């Protein structure tokens, strides 16, 4: 792990680093004189309060074309100046995430001191990028009633479906998936400020993190014709954080509801059948406060936000020992601080720290499915040490050459614990007829993951041409530790003892991976047509580190040797997109493309080879003293089936990474 981290860091230092993951916003166009002739050498300056440096500039090339890239979302004014011509100032240009606005102007002959200010409709169509994208701006995020998270908002995108629809924020505590155009639910990619933040565990599509809506300036959803910067197909979710500014500003958002804001369809027939308490909302609320501004004007900005939100739902026909209906209470708190420093004229640094904590009081266990869990037999989810840390540097070396670099980390501690109210000596008991767990949860899960991302690229930009080359490297591990009370689970049928599971806990698994992507993405405009060719190379290596686990009731302490490079994938994915400005006025574009995409994957692929995995014996249980507590002499060991040694799976040495077109 340390070696792979060092290698990735060294690569980042050697390359002239970064435009990290997706297309940047920009402004482009052509400058002409009244006769229609193109004008080279025109100085074009884009200015906006959202830029800590104030403005960015370039000059038109010999064909009169210009392009200014790496602009943050916001409102811009663009000024065009050339000796012998009146200057032109175009105002009200609105840029969203990964959007290139086309602004063509005509300069009139006159004195430079004379100026013309034009305020008109901002370009609405990106005629250069072939990517299909929908953007939820801050205004939309504030006005549309949703659960205030990227998944609930993503349901509004045309063509996007979700595994768990959210109504009124009742489902925001668990992360669903998004699909588009028949994509897999494992192909979502989550990014913050253009950096992929998913950890290596499970199928590779999990973050284990819950996002603060107040942090977001915009959320971009890219759904087709994705460029070479994108690691996979499917839905790419890019959350653009807010920066501070030269003016102090703050907002407060508050919403809430309870049982009085919903109808009740529980009728006498259902109650007569024994269903006397339905699932319903107990309470729901969301409080989100933001504040930001200058520490030093035009040099150092800060932005901070705190969010506390909760969704508490009553569980149908589930009651505690006092007869009260049990509730699944879920609470999340998140605090974020962002600093933006314009260190020198050509060097900008952004530092981002986001800390989140989640608690869920009544969650079903992750091992054995039951229709109903007694409150003491569910698990208590506590996620206390989750944070996102990022340092990002960018430098426009010249008007045509842009470099950036970023280092990103995201520790995840995702724990599903025994209920504090459960008796320390309780044994998990499952009634197979009633499908009910009693006593305590059958398993406690301690989940730990670490992920480090390093990204770098360099962009060369002219009026008609934008060439970008870069890399993205992710390395990390995912680990789970399993514990079972007494290392045993009892099975009954309508209260009659049947069998027991003798479990090899403490057990679990740990897997690691290193995923490196190298890409080249080009964009070239020929008249009204822009082509976007690219190619991406990916190397993905998965291993099982050396690991140890202590002794349990039925098994001794164990140590397992490292298994290196079980999966070693090397893939090449060509990408090609095209965009046609149909009428040449920047209002209508026809887009298309053909591309190869790897499927998103996680280190769970090699988990079946981990000898530390959970396993168990199933044995008959004869409860001689009728105390519903299995003693050793009541377990018929001679008739046990299964094994305390995990049944190892098989990973084909020639396994190829799945892909799609």
Annotate each language-model stretch with its function.
Residues 249, 279-360, 381-410, 574:
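Transmembrane beta-barrel wall of Gram-negative outer-membrane proteins
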């Amino acid at each position: 792990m340390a070696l792979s981290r060092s290698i990735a860091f060294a690569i980042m230092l050697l390359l002239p680093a970064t435009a990290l993951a997706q297309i940047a916003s920009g402004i482009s166009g052509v400058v002409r004189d009244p006769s229609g002739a193109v004008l080279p050498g025109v100085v074009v300056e884009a200015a906006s309060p959202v830029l800590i440096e104030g403005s960015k500039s370039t000059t038109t090339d010999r064909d009169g074309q210009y392009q200014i890239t790496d602009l943050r979302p916001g409102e811009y004014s663009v000024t065009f100046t050339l000796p012998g011509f009146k200057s032109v100032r175009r105002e009200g240009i609105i840029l969203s995430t990964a959007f290139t606005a086309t602004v063509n102007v005509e300069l009139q002959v006159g004195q430079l001191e004379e100026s013309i200010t034009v305020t008109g409709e901002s370009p609405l169509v990106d005629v250069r990028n072939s990517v299909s994208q929908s953007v939820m701006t801050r205004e939309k995020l504030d006005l549309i009633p949703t659960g205030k998270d990227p998944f609930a908002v993503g349901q509004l995108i045309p063509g996007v479906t979700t595994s768990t629809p959210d109504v009124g924020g009742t489902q925001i505590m668990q992360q669903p998936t998004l699909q588009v155009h028949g994509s897999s639910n494992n192909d979502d990619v989550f990014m913050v400020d253009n950096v992929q933040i998913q950890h290596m565990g499970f199928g590779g599509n999990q973050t284990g993190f819950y996002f603060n809506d107040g942090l977001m300036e915009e959320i971009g959803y890219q759904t087709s014709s994705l460029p070479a910067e994108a690691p996979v197909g499917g839905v790419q979710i890019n959350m653009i954080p807010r920066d501070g500014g030269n003016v102090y500003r703050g907002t407060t958002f508050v919403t809430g509801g309870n049982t009085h804001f919903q109808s009740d369809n529980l009728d006498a027939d259902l109650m007569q059948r024994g269903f006397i308490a339905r699932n319903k909302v107990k309470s729901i609320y969301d409080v989100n406060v933001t504040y930001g501004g200058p520490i030093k004007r035009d040099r150092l900005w800060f932005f901070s936000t705190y969010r506390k939100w909760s969704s508490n739902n009553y569980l149908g026909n589930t009651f505690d020992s006092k007869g009260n209906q049990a509730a699944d209470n879920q609470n999340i708190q998140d605090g974020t601080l962002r600093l933006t420093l314009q260190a020198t004229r050509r060097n900008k640094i952004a530092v981002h720290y986001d800390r989140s904590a989640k608690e869920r009081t009544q969650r079903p266990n992750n091992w054995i499915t039951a229709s109903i869990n007694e409150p003491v037999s569910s698990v208590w989810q506590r996620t206390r040490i989750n944070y996102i840390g990022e340092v990002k540097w960018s430098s426009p070396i010249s008007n045509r050459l842009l470099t950036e670099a970023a280092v990103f980390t995201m520790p995840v501690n995702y724990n599903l614990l025994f209920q504090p109210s459960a008796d320390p000596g309780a044994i998990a008991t499952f009634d197979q007829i009633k499908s009910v767990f009693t006593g305590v949860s059958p398993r406690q899960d301690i989940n730990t993951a670490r992920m480090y991302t390093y990204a770098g690229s360099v962009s060369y930009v002219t009026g008609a041409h934008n060439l970008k080359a870069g890399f993205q490297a992710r390395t990390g591990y995912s680990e789970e530790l399993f514990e079972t009370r007494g290392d045993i689970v009892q099975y009954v049928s309508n209260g009659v003892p049947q069998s027991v599971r003798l479990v090899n806990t403490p057990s679990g698994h740990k897997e690691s991976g290193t995923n490196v992507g190298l890409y080249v993405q080009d964009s070239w405009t020929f008249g009204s047509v822009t082509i976007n060719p690219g190619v991406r190379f990916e190397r993905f290596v998965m291993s099982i580190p050396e690991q140890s686990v202590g002794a349990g009731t039925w098994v001794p302490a164990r140590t397992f040797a490292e298994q290196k490079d079980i999966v070693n994938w090397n893939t090449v994915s060509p990408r090609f997109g095209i965009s046609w400005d149909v009428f040449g006025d920047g209002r209508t574009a026809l887009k298309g493309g053909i591309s190869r995409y790897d499927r998103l994957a996680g280190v769970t692929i090699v988990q079946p080879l981990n000898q530390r995995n959970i396993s168990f014996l199933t044995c008959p249980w004869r409860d001689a003293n009728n105390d519903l507590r299995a003693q050793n002499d009541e377990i018929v060991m001679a008739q046990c089936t299964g094994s305390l040694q995990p049944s190892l799976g098989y990973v084909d040495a020639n396994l190829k990474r799945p892909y799609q077109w």
